[in-house]
A protein has these predicted regions:
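NTP-dependent nucleotidyl-transfer catalytic core
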Residues: 1-249
């Protein structure tokens, strides 16, 4: 959650809501879950962007990251923090400050998303945070990696941990843990899907944007390797283009 919902998101929401209503009307135990990617570099950029605008509010300089966020909502949130907390964060510990701005940014951006979804009458029963899988020293993620290792699905190479995904339909093996100890995007995603299955769900439908189409095979190969070959279906939703007088807007 690094910004407002746009028309592309609205299309995804409408599609998912229709599928959910059909399943519910057919008597299925359907559960609607919104996955919140709040543990990656984008959230670091969100925090740094907010800090930059917060400093700007007080006439101070703090570099806006090259890959940061420039929209008006970032300025608005930074101003909210300044009005609430005053200038206490100008000289705060950098790590503590970043953590606070990340957390606050995610909370406020997600609140807007939740409010918009309510206006669409698109209700979710759970907002599943990615950071959940990093709690308790990444216990759920580590349990998942241990299970994969015990099943002979991983190997070490160049200091990194790899998944033998080519043995399960992928075009190349995938990194699970990088040589610096950080995780690839795939690893918490595998843990998330296993967590769904552990809660008793035997049919998973994911709605992803078209920019994630190459991700489908690697996720399906991971679940196949773990013994769940037919559990996941992924619908790819193309982006919406808004056109006015023949021109894209």
């Amino acid at each position: 959650p690094t910004g407002d919902l746009h028309c592309g998101h609205a299309r995804n929401a409408a599609w998912g809501d229709c599928i959910s209503r059909l399943y519910e009307a057919s008597g299925y135990n359907n559960y609607r879950e919104f996955y919140v990617n709040d543990a990656g570099n984008q959230i670091v950029m969100l925090g740094e962007s907010l800090i930059s605008r917060y400093f700007e509010h007080f006439g101070k300089e703090y570099p806006l990251p090259e890959d940061g966020y420039h929209a008006q909502d970032i300025i608005d949130i930074a101003n909210q923090i300044a009005e609430k907390d005053g200038d206490k964060w100008l000289n705060a510990d950098p790590a503590e400050r970043l953590e606070y701005f990340k957390k606050t940014g995610v909370e406020l951006e997600l609140k807007k998303i939740e409010d918009d979804l309510k206006l669409y009458r698109c209700d979710f029963q759970n907002f599943q945070h990615e950071t959940f899988f990093y709690e308790n020293n990444r216990k759920r993620i580590n349990d998942c990696l241990t299970k994969m290792a015990d099943m002979g699905l991983t190997y070490e190479k160049d200091g990194a941990l790899w998944f033998k995904s080519t043995e399960y339909g992928d075009d190349k093996d995938r990194v699970l843990r990088k040589s610096d100890g950080t995780l690839s995007y795939l690893t918490p995603d595998i843990a998330n899907h296993i967590y769904k299955i552990e809660r008793g769900y035997d049919h998973l439908i994911n709605l992803w944007g078209a920019d994630h189409h190459s991700y489908v095979t690697r996720m399906q190969s991971a679940l196949t390797a773990l013994g769940y070959p037919d559990v996941l279906k992924v619908d790819i939703i193309q982006m919406v283009r808004m056109v006015e007088d023949g021109k894209e807007v």
